[in-house]
Amino acid sequence: MVISSNAFIVGRVGELDLITAGWHFLQRTMNNEDRRGFEKMISMPGFCVKKFEETYLLKRVNPFAQTEEGRIIKFNSSDCPCGKSQDVHNISAMKDQLSNFLDKWENVHEKFSLPTGSSELTTSKTPIDVDTKEQENRLKQKAEAAPKSTPIENHKKNIQALCKQNAVAEQCLWNVYHVSGKPAEKKEQRNDMDRNISGVSVKDYETLKNFEDKSPPQAENASSSKKDEPISVECTDETSSRLSPATDISHEMAEHGTPDSGMISDVSEIKVLPAGKIEKKLIKELNPEMMVGRDGRRYRQKLREAEKQATVEFKLENFEQTNGEAQSVENDILTGKEKRRLKDKLRKEKKEQSKLFVEKDLEKNKESSSASLSTNKLAESPTEADKNSNVIHTNIKPKDICIETEYPANNDNKKKSEVMFSSTVTNVFGRNENQTSFDVKEHTVDSFELLPGEYRISNFGQQMADTTSAEMTALGKMPQEAGEVKPTVREHSGANFLQRERNFPLSLKTTVIANSPEGDIEGKRLSKGQKRRARNKANKGVYVVNENGSHSIELLPGEYKLLELDENKKIQEFPIDTRHYMRDDQTGGGSKIVEQGQRTKKKKNFYVAGNLSKNILDNGKWLAYVIDDKNSDGVPRVGEVSTEEVQETIKLLDSKISHNAIQDNSCSEDFEFGSSSSTNFVTGSSRSLLPELDADFVRKTLADYEENATEDAAENNNEVFESASEELEMFMNSEGIAPNFHSEFAKKTSPLLVGNAEFKDFCSKYSNSKYDNKTISKLVKKYIDTRIVHHYERFKKLADRESHRIAKSWTKIYETSSYSLMVMLYTNSPSSSVGFSDLEEILFNDR
């Protein structure tokens, strides 16, 4: 909002007038008890004049009133920035010094003023008198030589010297001094007092006292007989008149104040804090939960980080207790990416350990097929493998796992190396050498890539690769033993890497989902890029919610992303890739891609837009991603939600998907007849909102509805239906002459419409539509109902008797002819030259 300079200045002047009038009113209405309370209030260290004026004077509230409003509104000095200052004690000390200074000055003025005439004084000059006169002359010479300064200037210098380092205290003291401490005497009288008192020195108290006691009686003539009064600190009435344009002051300015609230000065703008020690002291004194601004946000962020770190350390301690061989994790503060990596690492280790302890009972029925596969591979002769240019021998044992590589014969430096992993594999996964070992014949794993000269094992977990890298040693070629597998090797054209197929235990396979009792849950292979894209979508709040992936829903923080929970309590996310992979033991060979349409069992509980059936809600359980906006990492957590929560979430998603919002149709002709958006919306919705908007309700409330309207309808029904199809033809065939209409409505409207070329063109354009009499009567009734409701509401709000008469007259009209429908459509069109008021003037002109 932009405020002009004129309005701003006028508002400020008016605000100052309100404050001035408020102070005068407060001074006139205070009694003795109120004065004592007010004196205590202004003596408080944290008292601020600006805050007091904003709270009471601008709002015209008497702080000493005994009404309910006065008792509710109390002045709180803690809200003022002055009360939060660390130097409130200095402020009170300076106020005490000011009061002591004024009291002392008054006492000195009264006691040590120049002596008046006295008859008891002698005129004899003694040596003591000479000495006192000399001392008096010296004092006068010193006072005249020194620069004259008023008490107010000395007081200002004293204040500046005391509170030079504290701007807030200086400002508060300045406010108190200028509001309540300004002298009330006239300028001439104050100058005389300053001139008379300037020569008095407080240090020579005894000398002046002796001089007063022993002064000669002739001093009466030389001394001034005028006795000055003490300085008064009472506020004087303001004599200057100001404009008070109360009508030009906006409500916002008068109620809440302008930017600096019309005070003497803005204390809040002065923020001069000395060192960092004061800030630490303030933080200790203030309540951390009540802190606002940047400091409060930073403090609460540190609290949240400390709580997160405590939970991470607690989980790590529990994990170390249950798994003794897990790696030790440093207790330093981990932030962001390091925490996520640590969580992923721990999750992978736990998953690998749980897979190693899977019982072999579920695999007994598959031993025959996997054993036949392994024997077929062992039947290959070593001579055929040596004919290839590149050969990789892989030996897997229960205790030792070896990798042997042989390079081409034309290579001068033939390198034969093996990598041996002894008991490290079992130690990593929580197994000892004496425990049950792997059975190589039972399972198969995915193929992976191996670069020349590099040896790496995939799908063993991150910790296995780290712990075994230090123990890799080069060994000679070892003979093959029973149970060893020699994989086939093939070279890709135009590439310098080898791809091979190896047989590893199925428990080490990370991308295969655990078996269900029926064996129909299929595994998915997702590349790193696909996983990264899915994770980014989840973090951003965008997720695919239906099976076919035809649309996506954007969710705000705190809402839910629906996922499926299968029979084994495992989360089934919606697939990014439409292809699915079957396991090797099901296909009898390598992994085979199966299209989505060939799957035997359809997944349940997939969200479909608009589907809120009981089967969807009650079939199984639902999980949801809950996005927590307070989580700094932005990683969604997974938790189970109730059916009611799922139902509300689906409603929310449906509202985001649906684009068929109900439009507010101003014209009745825009409604599609027979559709839910026309009949139900006009009749049903209007009845539920306001019964007066229902034309049938208005008809029943009118007086002569049952007597006249129903009888007329019964008499004229047959006539109208017979002549319904004839009136429009009669009008189209007429050439400027009014035809002999049968219905009363057509007869009365013929002078207005017959001869109107625009209406005739309108009828020729839209008269081709064929409606039955029932449809026409319903369409015409909509227009009549609109006019009834319009005039009845006008009668209710404006007490217009003419509108009541017209509404009652519309209830007597029952038209089913196509001519009356054309009249209504033409009158309702925006470009028509005839309105409903013209029709009503002709139809109901019975006065």
From Swiss-Prot:
GO cellular component: membrane
Gene Ontology terms for molecular function: hexose transmembrane transporter activity
Any one Gene Ontology BP term: monosaccharide transmembrane transport
Highest taxon of the lineage: Eukaryota
Start and end residues of each stretch annotated as Disordered: 116-153, 208-245, 361-392
Comp. bias regions, Basic and acidic residues: 128-145
Stretches with biased composition (Polar residues): 116-126, 368-378
Designated name of the protein: Uncharacterized protein C03B1.7
